[in-house]
């Protein structure tokens, strides 16, 4: 079955991430796959600064910035609000690293999954808390 990557870019040049940052590539391809009708929620992380400041943001989609532990709760609320508004065709995405998912954010993600919300959750596992000095996370392999 032939597949293709859409040409539309929802992540423009000029972000502030470190060179070679895997999180930026992950976000770029997630947005290509999900399209313009996407709302992304990110916790306190590198993604709080990667898109840049308004009005020069590099992402062409709405983003919600949440406390570290609240990504799961925010995507639950976003999904419910969009459904109530009649915008059920929007994709709702939580996009967090391994620290914000496997450690600090696990309880709110668990709640969102248990309630069965129609959302996407992307954990980009870079095996540490990269924006605060590369401390290990709960998903960092033993001995790494």
What are these regions (language model features)?
Residues 1-121, 128-130, 134-143:
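Cofactor-binding active-site loop characterized by glycine-rich and histidine/acidic residues
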């Amino acid at each position: 079955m032939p597949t293709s990557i859409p040409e539309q870019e929802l992540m423009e040049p000029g972000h502030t991430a470190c060179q070679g940052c895997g999180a930026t590539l992950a976000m770029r391809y997630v947005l290509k796959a999900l399209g313009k009708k996407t709302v992304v929620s990110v916790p306190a992380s590198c993604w709080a600064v990667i898109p840049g400041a308004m009005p020069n943001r590099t992402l062409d989609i709405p983003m919600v910035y949440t406390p570290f532990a609240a990504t799961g709760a925010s995507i639950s609320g976003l999904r419910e609000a969009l459904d109530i508004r009649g915008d059920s065709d929007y994709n709702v995405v939580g996009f967090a690293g391994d620290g914000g998912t496997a450690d600090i954010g696990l309880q709110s993600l668990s709640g969102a999954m248990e309630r069965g919300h129609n959302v996407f959750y992307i954990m980009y596992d870079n095996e540490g808390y990269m924006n605060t000095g590369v401390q290990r996370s709960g998903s960092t392999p033993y001995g790494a």
